[in-house]
């Protein structure tokens, strides 16, 4: 699915690198509103195993701002129309 405006009542989630490979998608739309801490739970329900294999080492942005889902930003509300990105670590050589 190409990134685009989320339908009413949804937010967009973008997958990069290993997250895209694991899900088989570059993006999708999920129901909103939801607390940031529940995004990983939603993804684990859709893609069993993604938590340990991918999400445990990922950075997350909400509307281009980095958030810490496991800490102080866990209660941040993801609203309709927001954009969440799942960004695995990038290695260089």
Swiss-Prot record:
Pfam families: ThiS (PF02597). Pathway: Cofactor biosynthesis; molybdopterin biosynthesis. InterPro entries: Beta-grasp_dom_sf, MOCS2A, MOCS2A_euk, Mopterin_synth/thiamin_S_b, ThiS/MoaD-like. The modification 1-thioglycine is found at residue 93. Keywords: Cytoplasm, Molybdenum cofactor biosynthesis, Nucleotide-binding, Phosphoprotein. Its main location: cytoplasm. One of its GO terms (biological process) is Mo-molybdopterin cofactor biosynthetic process. C-terminal thiocarboxylation occurs in 2 steps, it is first acyl-adenylated (-COAMP) via the hesA/moeB/thiF part of uba4, then thiocarboxylated (-COSH) via the rhodanese domain of uba4. The modification Glycyl adenylate is found at residue 93. One of its GO terms (molecular function) is molybdopterin synthase activity. Heterotetramer; composed of 2 small (MOCS2A) and 2 large (MOCS2B) subunits. Belongs to the MoaD family. MOCS2A subfamily. This is Molybdopterin synthase sulfur carrier subunit. The gene is cnxG.
């Amino acid at each position: 699915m190409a990134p685009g405006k989320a339908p009413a009542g949804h937010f967009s989630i973008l997958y990069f690198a290993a997250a895209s490979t694991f899900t088989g998608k570059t993006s999708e739309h999920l129901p909103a509103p939801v607390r940031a801490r529940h995004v990983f739970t939603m993804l684990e329900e859709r893609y069993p195993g993604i938590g340990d294999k991918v999400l445990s080492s990922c950075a997350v942005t909400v509307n281009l701002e980095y958030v810490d889902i496991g800490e102080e930003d866990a209660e941040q509300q993801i609203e309709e129309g927001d954009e969440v990105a799942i960004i695995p670590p990038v290695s260089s050589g």
